[in-house]
């Protein structure tokens, strides 16, 4: 169980205004895809205290698997939870990308945040999971507008996961990236094994894999004639012998860091498609 204290209950009123952002103090925007009351988010907030002005804008409820989607079909509401002068917490009824877009639009008119952080996710976002991840969708949104962005994920899906050992790792990486911003368009996908003492940190590439038999069909019974599909599935590693991937290092109890880019161009395969223009 997380040792981080709970955030205040849902507010009875909404409200927000311009927030003071001192020029000599780092400004950090924080979001997630598990919702503003998730233990991983609370742990990340506590890990960051003292590093600068922290603006949290997170979904009002879990939005796992929303990737880089945003809301265009309905209005989005923004509500203030608390602001103690160091950490301001808001939630909205949108996706993680909505949270980033709204926060940038509403709170960062005069200056961009120095850093966007997403997480700490309850569950891993290694290999192909990065494609579906709302945690990493928020990171890529930050990359698109030229802001150094990091996604943190713990390989533990439990809502009661213990983030005690993750907090110092997240703080250390945050401090280092504040001092050495990432190149434009590049974010970091950080996955942490669920062990008390990870063996170290490795910069690596994303593993090549996919999910098989993702949906299980459940037939209706005498209590309910409704049938449905339940998300499930088995991860298939296309390169189980590879020793330079995030999946490999996580299985060996190392923290994996994959530099991730919004540019999905397959540069190595340009010549392979010359026949299309001849």
Predicted regions, residues:
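Electrostatically charged, flexible surface regions
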Residues: 164-278
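Hydrophobic/aromatic ligand-binding patch that stacks against planar heteroaromatic rings
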Residues: 138-142
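Glycine-rich phosphate/pyrophosphate-binding loops
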Residues: 143-166
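Short glycine-rich anion-binding loops that position phosphate/pyrophosphate groups of nucleotides
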Residues: 34, 62, 95-96, 121-124, ...
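A cross-family phosphate/adenosyl-ligand binding-site feature
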Residues: 3-28, 38-106, 112
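Short, Asp-centered acidic motifs that coordinate Mg2+ and/or phosphate
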Residues: 115
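Short beta-strand segments
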Residues: 31, 57-59, 118-121, 152-153, ...
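Glycine/threonine-rich flexible loop motifs
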Residues: 124-133
């Amino acid at each position: 169980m997380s040792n981080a204290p709970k955030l205040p209950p849902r507010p009875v009123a909404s409200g927000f205004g311009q927030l003071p952002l001192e020029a000599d103090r780092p400004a950090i925007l924080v979001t997630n895809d598990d919702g503003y009351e998730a233990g991983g988010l609370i742990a990340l907030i506590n890990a960051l205290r003292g590093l600068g002005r922290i603006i949290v804008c997170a979904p009002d409820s879990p939005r796992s698997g929303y990737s880089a989607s945003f809301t265009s079909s309905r209005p989005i509401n923004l509500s203030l939870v608390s602001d103690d002068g160091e950490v301001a917490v808001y939630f909205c009824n949108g996706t993680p990308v909505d949270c980033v877009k709204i926060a940038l639009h509403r709170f960062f008119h005069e200056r961009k945040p120095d850093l966007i952080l997403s997480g700490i996710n309850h569950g891993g976002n290694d290999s192909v999971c990065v494609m579906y991840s709302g945690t990493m969708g928020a990171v890529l949104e930050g990359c698109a507008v030229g802001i150094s962005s990091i996604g943190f994920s713990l390989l533990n899906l439990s809502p009661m996961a213990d983030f005690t050992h993750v907090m110092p790792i997240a703080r250390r990486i945050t401090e280092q990236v504040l001092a050495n911003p990432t190149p434009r368009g590049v974010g970091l996908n950080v996955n942490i094994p669920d062990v008390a003492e990870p063996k170290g940190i490795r910069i690596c590439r994303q593993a090549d894999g996919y999910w098989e038999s993702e949906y299980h069909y459940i037939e209706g019974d005498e209590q309910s004639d409704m049938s449905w599909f339940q998300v499930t599935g088995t991860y298939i590693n296309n390169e189980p012998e590879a020793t330079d991937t995030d999946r490999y290092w996580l299985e060996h109890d190392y923290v994996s860091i994959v530099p991730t880019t919004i540019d999905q161009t397959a540069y190595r395969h340009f010549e392979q498609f010359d026949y299309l223009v001849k």
